[in-house]
Swiss-Prot record:
<dbReference type="GO" id="GO:0030248">
    <property type="term" value="F:cellulose binding"/>
</dbReference>
<feature type="region of interest" description="Disordered">
    <location>
        <begin position="53"/>
        <end position="80"/>
    </location>
</feature>
<dbReference type="InterPro" id="IPR000254">
    <property type="entry name" value="Cellulose-bd_dom_fun"/>
</dbReference>
<protein>
    <recommendedName>
        <fullName>Endo-1,4-beta-xylanase 6</fullName>
        <ecNumber>3.2.1.8</ecNumber>
    </recommendedName>
</protein>
<keyword id="KW-0119">Carbohydrate metabolism</keyword>
<keyword id="KW-0858">Xylan degradation</keyword>
<dbReference type="Pfam" id="PF00331">
    <property type="entry name" value="Glyco_hydro_10"/>
</dbReference>
<keyword id="KW-0624">Polysaccharide degradation</keyword>
<feature type="signal peptide">
    <location>
        <begin position="1"/>
        <end position="21"/>
    </location>
</feature>
<feature type="compositionally biased region" description="Pro residues">
    <location>
        <begin position="61"/>
        <end position="75"/>
    </location>
</feature>
<comment type="similarity">
    <text>Belongs to the glycosyl hydrolase 10 (cellulase F) family.</text>
</comment>
<dbReference type="InterPro" id="IPR035971">
    <property type="entry name" value="CBD_sf"/>
</dbReference>
<dbReference type="InterPro" id="IPR044846">
    <property type="entry name" value="GH10"/>
</dbReference>
<dbReference type="Pfam" id="PF00734">
    <property type="entry name" value="CBM_1"/>
</dbReference>
<feature type="active site" description="Proton donor">
    <location>
        <position position="205"/>
    </location>
</feature>
<dbReference type="InterPro" id="IPR001000">
    <property type="entry name" value="GH10_dom"/>
</dbReference>
<comment type="pathway">
    <text>Glycan degradation; xylan degradation.</text>
</comment>
Amino acid sequence: MRTPAIVLALAPAAAFGQAALWGQCGGQGWTGAKTCVSGAVCQAQNEWYSQCVPGSGGGNPPTPQPTQPSNPPPSTGSGLNAKFKNKGKLYFGTSMDHYDLNKAQLTNIVKAQFGQITNENSMKWDAIEPSRNSFSWTNADAVVNFATANGKLMRGHTLLWHSQLPAWVSNINDRNTLTQVIQNHVTAMVTRYRGKILQWDVVNEIFAEDGSLRSSVFSRVLGEDFVGIAFRAARAADPNAKLYINDYNLDIANYAKVTRGMVEKVNKWVSQGIPIDGIGSQAHLAQPGGWNPASGVPAALRALAAANVKEIAITELDIAGASANDYVTVVNACLQISKCVGITVWGVSDAISWRPNDNPLLYDRNYQPKAAYTAIMNAL
């Protein structure tokens, strides 16, 4: 698989003379090489980023194919995904990662039951670009290749997040440097998987609980501007992927993180031309009586769907105790909202859940379906 040469994007022209295939060759503030190696032509992606793409004499790069038709055909299978798609949705998916690929019980369930995969960790910044301009694709590639081989859609998770962030990024305090680093990282990732990712979580967990921006290197150095920088870079790299803003605690309709945070800010950013296609609600839910039980999800999803975005999705669903009624409540909430295109549960089995004491998933520690699984199947 091709490794983009964007790793050279910040190298001075004097050192390299010409930019390599897929390397940066222009844009506002660019001082590096502005001509491309033989067999490539410099093409402007936007005002701040030009890239060496295959061709000669000014030809365009190959047009990426749409990742998913807007109206998927009915599925003829019998698992969760098939039944959910037959209700008009795009997918019922799960998270997994490269370290799960040798677990036969898990992969067999994924193949039979789920239609979409999210990398749990291997697409996060510390895994992909642990040091500046040094990219490590092996683990992320393994999951994408598994998904492609088995006909599964992919959600890319995540391009910008304050956590699992290398120190070399966290320590940046210069606006221009951080802008270039974001553009380079986002472009490298989205370009590599262009045409293979249905939805990208472009920015993840950027809001504090009061709806303000979370304090992070991105907000401290760039203010709100990092959102537009990241989304525009992602759109330029893959015009067909759906671009999401993703967060947790979006499960109560009148909570500030939903109202003053997600809905208000997204509407403002979309009005400014920032290409935000969707809102992802993680939905790490509590048991009844807890802070954010499943009973709040229907109204919360309606509040999110009222934002000026094309679609919404439940992106990391797990529910403490895995009550059958709670899972059916969430599934029905998505079914009743046309903008809700899919549900992803955050893991296959309680044996590998990040909430091991809550037993929050659809399969138990022995990879056997629980009552919640049966209830969803019956509801569909």
